[in-house]
Each structure stands twice: as C-alpha cells, then as structure tokens.
C-alpha cells in the first residue's frame, strides 16, 4: 500500500443529518433546485465528461470532502475587494483550468460578473492557482503554474496587473507562507529526483536493504507530481537567498504550514519519524495502533505532530510533546509571533490538565513561544472561523454540528480562555457576506448578502448548463444493517423514475453528506453516481452509522469488515422491501479504505453481487501486508500474518477467500508501482479463471485530477456496470 494511505483518508469527517425519505416530493431551499419539470424537459442524460467539465469552487479541502481551507471569498484587508477561485476540467485538452475572479465589494450587487484577474492551467495533479493571500490592499501572492512549468510563488499587483515571480526554486514549490511585510518566505518543495536502484554505485556494489520503502527500491525514475511525503523546507529572505531547514521527519503539502506575521517563527505539522514510547498512553482508538506500530528507526509513521521553526536560527523542534488528531490541524497567530493557536493537538502527558478524556481527544490551545506554555481553549472538535486581533477573540466552528449554533467565541481574560456570548453579526468585519450554497439536489451557487439590511442576491451560478441534463433526484434514507446498527445514506433515482419498477443497484461507499451536491460521489476516483443513474441504474451512496463516532470503534479491528458488510446487506434488504431494486443485479464500488469493505463483502457475504470495482485501496490482503507492513492489515485480520495469527488471516483476509467470489471485478490502481497493491487479487483471479479487468494509471494520484484519467476511471465504472447489470441484448451476447 502506498505510504500516503492515512493522508488519503484524513478528509473523511462525516456529518449526520436526518431528512425525510420522499420519493419525488416537493423540494424547497434557499438555493435554486433542479425541479421535476426541468428533469422532464432535459435534453439528454448527463455523462462522465459533463461532470468533469463543470465549474467548481477551487479549494483543496473542499475537493477532499471536508471544510474549505479558505473562505469562498478572500477579502482584502480593508474589505473593499475580494477574490473567488474557480476551476474547470477540459477533456479535449486534458487540463484543469483555473480562474481567479476579482470583485469590488461595493459593486457586488450591481455587477456580479467579476473581473478575471488571472488564468492558469494545470496538466499535472497540482492546482494551477492555489494558496491565494492578500499581502496588502493592492497586492496578492499565490502559488501558480502553467503546463510544462514548475509551480512557484508569485505576486501580482491588482491595479497594474504586474506579475512578479518571488521564488525561482529548482523543483516544484508545493506550499508556502509569507510575512506581513512580504520580506520573509517559507516554503516546501519537492526534492530533487533520487534514484536508488539505478545509480552507478548501486549497479556496481549492490544495495543494503534495511529501512527503505518498496517504492524507493522499485522507482521507475519518472517525475512525480502527486502529493507525497518527502518535501523539503526552505526559508527565503527579501534578497531571494534560500536556506534549507533540515528535518528528520516527513513533510507534505497536505499538512498546514504557517509563518508568523513578523516572520520570526513558523509552525507546521509533520509525520514524525521517532514516536516517544510514552505516547502509547494516549487512548484515541484510531490513532493508537499507529503510535505503537513497530517500525524501523527513521521511517515514516502515520502520526502527526506540530513543529516550531525558528526562522533566524534555521532550526526546527516540536511545538508540543504530543500528537495531533487526524484531520484537525489548523493554525492561527493571535500576535505578531509571541504565541500561536493550534487545533486538534493532544495535551502533553505531563500537563496539569486532569479533565476526563484528556488522553482520548485533541484540544484547541494557545502556545506561548518560545517556552511552549499551553493555554487550553476547548476540547471540542472545531475549525478556526475567525481571529479578531483588535478584541483578542477567536471564533471556532464545530466540525460535527447537527443543528442550532455551530460557532462559539472565546476571549482571553486574566490569562485564561473563556467562552463568551457568540454574535453572528460580530463574527465578521465585512458588510457583505459571500456564501457557497448547495445541498444534495441543489447545484452550488455563490450568493452575496448584505449583513446590515438583509438584502440577498445570486452572485454566481457556477453551472447553469446543468439545467440541460436529466439529473436524478437524491433522497436521504436510513436503514438497519444486518447486525442491527442504523446507517444513513443517499439514494440517486434514475431520471424518469417509474414507480413499481425494480432497478439494478450500484452501492457507492466512503460516506454521504446531504449538504453537498455530488454529481459523482465523495471524490472523482471510480465513483460516477449521476452518470450511472442516467443509464437506468439506481445508486446508493452509503454513509456512516447514525450514532456519531460509533464507526471509529471498529476501525482496524476484526469487526471492521463484518460491520461494513452488514451495512451493504441491510441496504439491499431495505431497498428490496421498498420495491425499488432488483436484488439479483447489485454492484459495489470500493475506493481507498472501502476497497477492503467491498473486498470483504465479496468474499464473506452470503448475498450475491453481480459486479464490483476495487479502486486504489487497501484490501486487507496478504501480499500487501508483506510489501508495506501497515498495522491496518494486522488489525482487520486479527494478528500477524505468520505463526498463530495466520489462522485468523485464513478466515478473515479477502486474499484467502477469492475462490468464493462470483462477481466480475474491475481493479484500478494509480501512480508509480501502485499496481502492486492489486496484483494479488488480479493474479489469484486469473489463476481461478474468474472475470477480472485490471487498469493501471501510471501517473494518476489517489484522488484523480487529470480529465483523461478521470474518464478512464469513472467512465470505466459506468461501462463496467452497464455491461454486467443491464439486461440488454448486447450484454446477453457478451455474457
């Protein structure tokens, strides 16, 4: 399994929201919805290509399925102007095009079109325009690239449109921050290409294998542009003189990097290489297996920690002696550089904090620099919404709010942080508010609202062309899994749904969020919900247990596979009971972690599945465990794959049960050497003469970005299920 497995799943922060299950009921929200009349008048079914070429809000964490890293509108310090970043795929050119739109705040209602300040296109897996920051009221900085260019940090003057490149690094710059005066930069960059097996020394003397990862030994020498955990850290002064900050830990652009306003310090989070033995006393049920995992010294772990960089000294050390809860890393500076606020960190074990659960969950804290004195703010799971420097108040938004007030404000009084009454009107300095609004049936639109008089207007309809397509209605449903727990998900009805007709079903995995408009599903690898529905296939997007956090207790245990399998089985029973599906024509898509869930169901369930897709994921297999030795394999299979534990592997691992699989399986793996993760399933299926189709995208990243690779994957899923689920004359001849 590629070493970015944990990083790939970090964005799975699910929210539960019960909505009535209405077949084709009336749908009313503040957003403009696709009505039944528009469905009937649609010109044609939507295709995978249509979904690739939609316009999207271009935020990395929004793309990952989580809370956006940046607000929809990035306001200038004086609030007089704001920027919106958008992206759109082009299948014909195989690029993703980015636009940076500039608006004047006082003209947002009168002239909502905006000015295109910058256009850039990417043929890589990176964003062409990202990490946009206002340096002052007239200047912004950003990370940008065009085809056949390395990404670098740029500065552009809003009025003169003069573009200046601030970095000239020899490799791709992947993350950065800049001081308030623009004189100090810190950035992460890809390392120079290092080959292990192809060097003259290796060919002459051989290689001693000890702590290398498999990917290093078998690397084909090709350039990589997917997010990997090998980045190097540099600081650069106003004279463009670079200095590297060395670290024995592992850096990636998927973790935050923040420079203090005065440029003296920086805070970032890293994957640590040396985990203190004492950290085994932390009790987080998901994180702990990676803390106690046996690893060779100096190798990558799946444990993250905040680090403090002294820019002047060129040194790095831990900010706190504690790990971070996955996916909760955010940083804010309440002063020029004397202290920093971070979210999601556990408290050091020697802290005086005696609160129940202090070892079980993360906290938001203020840390004084350089002494690392900790001031606790809250133990809730939150994201940083706003820092009010004038009042010294911070507003934090709950990550799992199910209703009511979702934000709380804290102020420091007499050296302690205390919650104070939250006022929505005082939570921002802006007269106008820019918001992205969407839900399961409402395509994203951007609205402008006057916070004083309540006036509200549509600023930008991202995809008015969607009204031309027949798009299936999505409804929320709950059901009982066969083991008794209750699950929530979303049903995609085929356009023109006929009551009483039983449809084939494809079960998509990896979560359901009713507040998001998903044409394909959570991500763009393998999933293709609306294009499948357009072919007359009902799609169920499976979410989590309705009891918040309950599923976490089963992760990396022998109960994980059976629990997820029972959710699939219960869904089939419920939809069959409602007369919606033909239970003899059911397919499954597993991606990333849920490839294991689907593989387990294919090999252990008594329910019969007609077809399946396993895409770029952990499958709980024996070969993968020998290659990458992750604790996940030992966790879900009940022990080590040798000695006494081998018996449990024979019973639980899908790899030893492939002879029981009756469904044709399509395998997809992305990136250099990642095909090895699917080789066991492919080889054993081939030996058993079972229908198997294996696709490898050599330069694909885990969450596919390039339009042609998305076509191969997502259209491949549509074609696969059309072939095996639809009862057509062509398919009957093919079978």
Model-identified regions with their sequence ranges:
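Mobile cap/lid helix-loop segments that gate and shape the active-site cleft of serine hydrolases
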Residues: 516-518, 611, 616-663
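Non-catalytic accessory segments flanking enzyme active sites
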Residues: 70-73, 81, 86, 266-270, ...
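Multi-bladed beta-propeller domains
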Residues: 31, 35-68, 103-130, 156-174, ...
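Cap/lid segment of the alpha/beta-hydrolase catalytic domain
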Residues: 461-578, 582-584, 591
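Primarily recognizes the serine-hydrolase "nucleophile elbow" in alpha/beta-hydrolase
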Residues: 573-624
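Blade-terminus and WD-like Trp-Asp/Gly-His loop motifs, strongest in beta-propeller folds
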Residues: 73-81, 131-139, 176-184, 256-266, ...
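C-terminal catalytic histidine-bearing segment of alpha/beta-hydrolase fold enzymes
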Residues: 689-735
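Predominantly five- to eight-bladed beta-propeller fold
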Residues: 96-108, 190-242, 271-309, 350-365, ...
